[in-house]
Amino acid sequence: MNIILFGPPGAGKGTQAKFLVKILNNFQVSTGDMLRDEIKKDTDIGKKIISYMNDGKFVDDEIVNSLIEKVVFDSSKKGKLIFDGYPRTIAQAKNLDLLLTESKQQIDFIFFLNVNKETIIKRIEKRKVEERRGDDDLDTILKRYDTYLKTTSPVLDYYSSKQNFYKLDGNLEIDQINKQIRDFLKL
């Protein structure tokens, strides 16, 4: 089963994806992790990525889509993908549709974690201390949140009319959000 988890930065997409990986034995496709991995490797792509992230901007679709393509066409992961933070733009959503069609797959569930700005700030401040992520300073997060609102709203419109779309209250506690997801998945 292929699943999309999307919502603003700090919504808990990664946390919920990790739960689903354990329950379903699926693979987490975290664009954030993939991008940070490129930065760690100090590749040319990694250097481009860091400039986007430091400016609070989304990384160019072409870069992100190329990383996603490798995962979608990995036969060992077919039908077992949990997309965490992808797609973020209409171009990415359409690219994902195309890749899945070409690889004879589909999205089974789309979960939108709807979270208010105050909750996000609290979560990011906590995550900054616990995980020491460089992209978690408040100014960068606020820029990413504003970029998210402008860029990802059309993606919400794109998916919200689909039968397998579920809007969840992402302001709830982690276990409550997880229960909502498990209920929809009938787990």
Name each model-derived stretch.
Residues M1-L187:
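Glycine-rich phosphate-binding loop of ATP-dependent small-molecule kinases
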